[in-house]
C-alpha cells in the first residue's frame, strides 16, 4: 500500500480521514472550528498531548509538509450574479482561502468536496472561477458529480468532487473511480426491520393500452419498471407511490375529488407563473360542478387547504419536501437506499414492516393500511445515520444526539473517499508502481 501524507481541512468529524487512512494515508494536521465536531474528532483520534488542529483556515499561511490537501468546503447559496461577486458570501470566501493555501503550499494533489448545486448550470461561472484558479496555479483539474450509493453506501447522496494534480509531475491517466454494484437493502443496515418475503421487483410490470411498459419508478436509483420502494407524502404531485392528506385524513369522496382537481390544475399557467398557484373560488368552481364555497372552507378546517388574505386557496402542505405532518418520505425495509442526510435534518422515515401488492393500487392500499395508519414507521437513530453515511460501528459520537445528526449530515461519506484515494494511487502519484482499484 502506497503511503502518503495529507491535511484535513474543514475536517468535521473525520470522514475524509477515515477514507484516506484506509488506503495508506497519514494525517499530519487538520483544521476545524466547530467545537462539537472537534470533540468527536479528538475522541476518535486522540492528540497524544499535541494538538494538530490548525483552527481557522482564514488565519493559516504555511501548512505542515504534506502530499495531498483535502476538505469538504462549506457550501454557499449558489446564486452569484457575476464574477465580481463570486466570493462575496463568507462561505464563498472560504474557496478563496482554499485556493490561497494551495498556492502557498503546492501540494502534489488535492481533493475538495461540495454540494451538487456547484455544478448547476446557473452556477457555471462560480465553478469556472474555481477550476480556472487551480489551473492557473499549475494543476490539472478534474471534477465529477458522484453519488455515495454507487460506492456501497445505502444513501442517495450526490456531491461534487474536484481533484487536482500538479502538472509538473507529468502524470496522465487520472480517472474517477468506477461504480460498484451492491445488493444491500435497508434491512441489512438498519435495526429491527422486518425482512420482506417478496421483492418489489417481482411485482408484475404495468402496461398501457398499447402494451407498452409503464415505468413507475420515480427516482433515478429505482430500477426501470419497478415500483418505488418508498412512499412520498405530499399534496402537490401524483403517482403510484404518492400519498395525499385527503387519503389519510377522514374525507368524503366528494372532498377527495375536489382535492384531486385542484392538484391537477394548480400548475396551469392561467392561474399564475409559479410551479403551483393559489386558485380563487371562481377558478375552482369552473372545474368542479356545483361547488359551494363552504366545501372549500371545510377543507380549510381539516388543514388540507389554506386560504390567503386575498381569498385564494392553496394546499396546506404546499411544499413538496415538507411532506405531511412533518413526514416527507417513508422508505420500506427492502429499499436499496435512504434519503440524503443533511445538517439541517430531514423528513424521511423508515417503515418497520414490508408491504407488497399485485398492482399499483393494491401496493399503495396495503402501505396505507399496514404502515401509515397504524404508524408503523419511525425516524432513524444516530447509529443508523452513521451506517448510512458509511461510518464504522466502532466510531465514537457526541453525547448530544441532535448534534450528531448535524455532524453526520455535514460529513463526507468515507467509502467515496476510499475510492478516490485509490484512484490517486493508480496514477503513481506516491510511488512508481502499478496498482489496481
Curated annotation (Swiss-Prot):
GO terms for molecular function: DNA (cytosine-5-)-methyltransferase activity; DNA binding. One of its GO terms (biological process) is negative regulation of gene expression via chromosomal CpG island methylation. Pfam families: DNA_methylase (PF00145). Residues 4-431 form the SAM-dependent MTase C5-type domain. The keyword Nucleotidyltransferase does not apply. PROSITE patterns: C5_MTASE_1, C5_MTASE_2, SAM_MT_C5. InterPro entries: C5-Methyltransferase, C5_DNA_meth_AS, C5_MeTfrase, C5_meth_CS, SAM-dependent_MTases_sf. It catalyses: a 2'-deoxycytidine in DNA + S-adenosyl-L-methionine = a 5-methyl-2'-deoxycytidine in DNA + S-adenosyl-L-homocysteine + H(+). Its EC number is 2.1.1.37. The keyword Transferase applies. It is an enzyme of class 2 (transferase). Keywords: DNA-binding, Methyltransferase, Restriction system, S-adenosyl-L-methionine, Transferase. Disulfide bonds: none annotated. The active site is at 75. Belongs to the class I-like SAM-binding methyltransferase superfamily. C5-methyltransferase family. A methylase that recognizes the double-stranded sequence 5'-GGWCC-3', methylates C-? on both strands, and protects the DNA from cleavage by the HgiBI endonuclease. This system is less active than isoschizomeric RM.HgiEI. PANTHER family: CYTOSINE-SPECIFIC METHYLTRANSFERASE, DNA (CYTOSINE-5)-METHYLTRANSFERASE 1. This is Type II methyltransferase M.HgiBI. It comes from Herpetosiphon aurantiacus (Herpetosiphon giganteus).
